[in-house]
């Protein structure tokens, strides 16, 4: 899980730097941001699922030590859909890619 989180964080930092320095035009940066969102939400879903697996039954209870995992696992799909579904974002990224 740490590898996935660190790779997502590094990608976000790289895109923020490119935006701040004006290194990329808005179209290519938009496509890269769309790909990064898909990557981040897939990693979020994976980490929520694995954390739920680690905690077992406690991750399904809204109280106690598993309450945070329960909430994240319940809301993971909402965060993936908000701002554009993965399919729409992937299509946009491909259309805006510089090939």
Where are these regions (language model features)?
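Alpha-helical interface subdomain recognition
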Residues: 1-99
């Amino acid at each position: 899980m740490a590898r996935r989180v660190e790779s997502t964080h590094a990608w976000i930092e790289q895109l923020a730097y490119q935006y701040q320095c004006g290194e990329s035009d808005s179209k290519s940066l938009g496509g890269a941001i769309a790909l990064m969102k898909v990557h981040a939400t897939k990693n979020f879903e994976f980490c929520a699922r694995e954390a739920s697996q680690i905690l077992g039954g406690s991750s399904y209870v809204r109280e106690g030590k598993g309450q945070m995992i329960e909430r994240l696992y319940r809301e993971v799909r909402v965060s993936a859909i908000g701002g554009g579904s993965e399919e729409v974002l992937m299509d946009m990224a491909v259309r805006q890619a510089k090939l």
